[in-house]
């Protein structure tokens, strides 16, 4: 296998098949666009296990993803896609940068889910990008924007229901999409406590990367609690 790319939390490798990749989940944790860094033993394995269960659930409910199979504790086989240069962000409850941006308290349930795009560029700080700007700059087409919005809001409903069954509130999350060589758009990357804010429904205890961002305790204990609830 040849390493093709290394990001903050994952590595991408070629395989014997031209249309498949291996994604290796790392134990690295970052926050603030990489300003805060640490290596946390077991984090990659936990994120892979959680992402696997979520992708399998989404596939069963009609969401097309890049997921093929999980090979071992750190590696996932996926369909080859070119990642679109956008992070898609959905918010159900105010928290983090959204609460700070609008001067509202954390924990307020929004009247409806919000759909935001962020342009993926660490040097620019991943700026928010509205529909008009994304289309005008040629980042996506109008048809792609409409598809991303519809698919993402469907994913949100599935995830909210999934987590509510295990007494977790889905506060917000970010996802990424990729395109296959023939132009099909697939949900890619991962869905884990690295990319979602998850709060205990009764206590609002944070069980996500805010544990690391805000120095709230042992990150892996929070992630293990999420995984254990998912496994029942």
Curated annotation (Swiss-Prot):
Reaction(s) catalysed (UniProt annotation): 5-amino-1-(5-phospho-D-ribosyl)imidazole-4-carboxylate + L-aspartate + ATP = (2S)-2-[5-amino-1-(5-phospho-beta-D-ribosyl)imidazole-4-carboxamido]succinate + ADP + phosphate + 2 H(+)
GO biological processes: 'de novo' IMP biosynthetic process; cobalamin biosynthetic process
Main enzyme class: ligase
Cited InterPro entries: SAICAR_synt/ADE2_N (IPR028923), SAICAR_synt_PurC (IPR033934), SAICAR_synth (IPR001636), SAICAR_synthetase (IPR050089), SAICAR_synthetase_CS (IPR018236)
Gene Ontology terms for molecular function: ATP binding; phosphoribosylaminoimidazolesuccinocarboxamide synthase activity
Pathway stated in the Swiss-Prot or TrEMBL entry: Purine metabolism; IMP biosynthesis via de novo pathway; 5-amino-1-(5-phospho-D-ribosyl)imidazole-4-carboxamide from 5-amino-1-(5-phospho-D-ribosyl)imidazole-4-carboxylate: step 1/2
Coiled coil ranges: none
Xref: PANTHER family: MULTIFUNCTIONAL PROTEIN ADE2 (PTHR43599), SI:DKEY-6E2.2 (PTHR43599:SF3)
Family: Belongs to the SAICAR synthetase family.
Name this polypeptide is given: Phosphoribosylaminoimidazole-succinocarboxamide synthase
Organism of derivation: Finegoldia magna (strain ATCC 29328 / DSM 20472 / WAL 2508) (Peptostreptococcus magnus)
